[in-house]
Amino acid sequence: LSAQINSMTSPWYLHFMRYDPTASLKKIKCPVLALNGEKDIQVDADMNLTAIRQHISENGNKNVTIKVYPKLNHLFQTCEKGTLAEYGQLEETINPEVLKDMTEWIKKQQ
């Protein structure tokens, strides 16, 4: 419990919780690949990806690729619940489909 309290009161964590990325997103002009796991309990996929698409496209950037992966957690591992406790119990490091999609997206940008 003490370690959790310390991490949640650290300067980095407090800055991160207060940070609003809207202004930064509006400045992005390069191609963007935004991915989320459907079972990510740390970052809500719909809220996150909707905001990314909206704010990046406000500056005219239409090169935004968005994808939500069913049954994947924050670390892009196939999971049941998506909880932090489950991370260490999963054999998969990262789902192969995510790596494939990332590779294909990067190749298309060249």
Placement of each model-derived feature along the sequence:
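Catalytic active-site module of serine/aspartate enzymes centered on a nucleophile-bearing elbow/loop
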Residues: N59, T65-Q110
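Solvent-exposed, polar/charged alpha-helical surfaces in well-ordered, non-transmembrane soluble domains
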Residues: A23-K26, T50-Q54, P96, K100, ...
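Alpha/beta-hydrolase
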Residues: L1-A23, C30
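Short beta-strand/loop motif that positions the catalytic acidic residue
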Residues: I28, A34-N36, D40
